[in-house]
C-alpha cells in the first residue's frame, strides 16, 4: 500500500486545527510528514528536539532549520538536559519531548500535534509491551489519535510501513537524515527492530502488519472494557470515593479492574500489579484506618465503608521556613540545616517518643496522643542522619 497524500491531508483537516505542530527530527518519517502537511493552508510549527547524544545532533538541527526556511515554516529547537541517573533514557526522553510539545501547544487555541510513528513502530511497541507482561491497555500500543489537555496528537502515518514511507520520500525527492544510533542494540527498541523482528519475519514476512493488527484489536477491546467498567464504577462510587460493600459484591477480576480504573480516573496515574493485589486484599478484609502509600503524592485509606484517595500535603504547601522555626523552638540543640531532611509520612515510620525506651509506629503514637485522623495527613517527618528526630507539627522524637 502506497501513501495517499490526499487521505493524510483530509485526515488532518477533519480536526480543523488552528495550528499544526510537527515533531520534526529530520528522519524519513517526520520529513515525509512535514512534506505532506506543508501543503495545508494552516499555520505550521516544526519542533526539533536535540537529545545531545550524537556527534551530529547539531548538524541535524541545522538541516531541519534550513528545510523549514526553504518552505517558509516556523522552526523551534529545544535541547534536553542530561538524563537523571538511574532513569531509562527512552522513557525519560519521551516524557521530556511530550512536555515541550504541550508547552508550545498551549500558546494556540486549537493545536494539533503530528508525530511520524508508523506501522513498524507499532509492531515494536507491541513486542515491548508483551515482554513487560502488559495487559490490554499496554498491548494496544501507540494510539492513532489521543486527546490532550490542550489539543490532540495525531499519527497520520501509523498504518503505513517504514518501506512505504521510504518509497514516498524517494519518489518525491525528500531529503532526510539517517541516525546511525538506531543500530545501537543497547537500546531495547533497537534490539527488537534489528534482531528480533528479522527472525520473526522468517516465520511471517508480514509480521509488522500482523502485530500492528493485534495492537488495534487490543485497543478496540480495551475501549469496550473501559466503557463497561466506567459505567459500573459510577454505580459504586460516591464522589471520588469507592463504596467497599458494593465493590466486593463483584467478581474478583472485575474488582481489580475497577480499583485500577478508579485510581487512574482520580489521579491520572496507574497502579502497579502488586498495589492492585494489596488493595484487593484490603477491601475484602476491610479495617478502618488501613492505608497504603502509592507514591510520594498519593495515599489510599479505608475509612469505614469507603476507599479514599488522600493527597498528602507537600513541603510546598507548608513553608519549610515554618517547619524549621517550629523545630528550633522545640528541639533543645543547635540545628545543622544541611543535615535536615523533610518528607511525607510512610506507613512503617517509627519514633522513640520522649521518655520511652523503644520506638513505636507513628500510627500508635497518634492514637495514644489522640491526634484526629483528619489531622494526621498534615504530618511532616523531619530526619537527621537518616533518623527521625521530629514529627511536625506534633512532637519531638528521641
From Swiss-Prot:
Cellular-component GO terms for this entry: cytoplasm
Localization terms from the record: Cytoplasm
Gene3D superfamilies: HUPs
GO molecular function, one term: tRNA(Ile)-lysidine synthase activity
Coiled-coil region list: none
Catalytic activity: cytidine(34) in tRNA(Ile2) + L-lysine + ATP = lysidine(34) in tRNA(Ile2) + AMP + diphosphate + H(+)
Keyword Cell membrane attributed: no
GO process annotations (BP): tRNA modification
Protein's UniProt keywords contain Metal-binding: no
Classification via InterPro entries: Lysidine-tRNA-synth_C, Rossmann-like_a/b/a_fold, TilS/TtcA_N, tRNA_Ile_lys_synt, tRNA_Ile_lys_synt_N, tRNA_Ile_lys_synt_subst-bd
Domain notes: The N-terminal region contains the highly conserved SGGXDS motif, predicted to be a P-loop motif involved in ATP binding.
NCBIfam families registered for this protein in UniProt: lysidine_TilS_C, lysidine_TilS_N
Function: Ligates lysine onto the cytidine present at position 34 of the AUA codon-specific tRNA(Ile) that contains the anticodon CAU, in an ATP-dependent manner. Cytidine is converted to lysidine, thus changing the amino acid specificity of the tRNA from methionine to isoleucine.
Family: Belongs to the tRNA(Ile)-lysidine synthase family.
Name this protein carries in UniProt: tRNA(Ile)-lysidine synthase
Organism: Francisella tularensis subsp. mediasiatica (strain FSC147)
Gene coding for it: tilS
Amino acid at each position: 500500500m502506497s501513501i495517499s497524500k490526499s487521505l493524510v491531508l483530509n485526515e488532518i483537516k477533519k480536526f480543523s486545527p488552528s495550528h499544526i505542530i510537527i515533531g520534526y527530527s529530520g528522519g524519513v518519517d517526520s520529513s515525509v510528514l512535514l512534506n505532506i502537511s506543508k501543503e495545508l493552508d494552516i499555520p505550521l510549527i516544526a519542533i526539533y528536539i536535540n537529545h545531545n547524544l550524537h556527534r551530529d545532533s547539531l548538524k541535524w538541527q541545522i538541516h531541519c532549520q534550513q528545510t523549514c526556511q526553504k518552505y517558509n515554516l516556523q522552526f523551534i529547537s529545544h535541547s534536553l538536559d542530561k538524563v537523571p541517573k538511574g532513569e531509562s533514557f527512552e522513557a525519560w526522553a519521551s516524557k521530556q519531548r511530550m512536555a515541550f510539545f504541550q508547552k508550545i501547544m498551549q500558546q494556540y487555541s486549537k493545536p494539533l500535534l503530528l508525530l511520524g510513528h508508523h506501522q513498524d513502530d507499532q509492531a515494536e511497541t507491541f513486542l515491548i509491551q508483551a515482554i513487560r507482561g502488559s495487559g490490554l491497555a499496554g498491548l494496544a500500543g501507540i494510539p492513532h489519535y489521543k486527546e490532550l489537555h490542550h489539543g490532540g496528537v495525531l499519527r497520520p502515518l501509523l498504518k503505513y510501513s517504514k518501506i512505504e514511507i521510504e518509497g514516498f520520500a524517494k519518489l518525491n525527492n525528500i531529503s532526510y537524515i539517517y541516525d546511525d544510533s538506531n543500530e545501537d542494540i543497547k537500546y531495547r527498541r533497537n534490539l527488537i527492530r534489528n534482531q528480533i523482528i528479522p527472525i520473526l519475519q522468517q516465520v511471517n514476512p508480514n509480521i509488522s502488519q500482523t502485530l500492528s493488527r493485534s495492537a488495534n484489536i487490543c485497543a478496540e477491546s480495551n475501549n469496550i472494557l473501559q466503557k463497561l467498567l466506567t459505567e459500573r464504577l459510577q454505580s459504586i462510587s460516591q464522589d471520588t470515593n469507592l463504596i467497599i460493600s458494593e465493590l466486593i459484591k463483584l467478581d474478583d477480576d472485575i474488582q481489580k479492574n475497577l480499583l485500577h480504573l478508579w485510581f487512574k480516573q482520580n489521579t491520572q496515574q496507574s497502579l502497579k500489579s502488586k498495589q492492585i493485589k494489596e488493595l484487593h486484599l484490603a477491601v475484602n478484609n476491610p479495617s478502618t484506618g488501613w492505608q497504603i502509600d502509592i507514591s510520594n503524592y498519593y495515599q489510599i485509606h479505608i475509612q469505614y465503608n469507603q476507599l479514599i484517595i488522600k493527597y498528602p500535603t507537600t513541603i510546598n504547601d507548608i513553608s519549610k521556613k515554618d517547619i524549621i522555626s517550629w523545630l528550633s523552638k522545640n528541639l533543645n540543640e543547635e540545628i545543622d540545616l544541611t543535615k535536615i531532611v523533610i518528607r511525607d509520612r510512610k506507613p512503617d515510620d517509627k519514633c522513640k517518643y520522649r521518655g520511652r525506651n523503644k520506638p513505636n509506629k507513628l500510627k500508635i503514637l497518634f492514637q495514644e496522643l489522640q491526634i484526629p485522623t483528619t489531622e494526621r495527613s498534615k504530618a511532616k517527618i523531619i530526619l537527621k542522619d537518616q533518623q527521625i528526630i521530629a514529627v511536625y507539627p506534633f512532637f519531638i522524637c528521641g
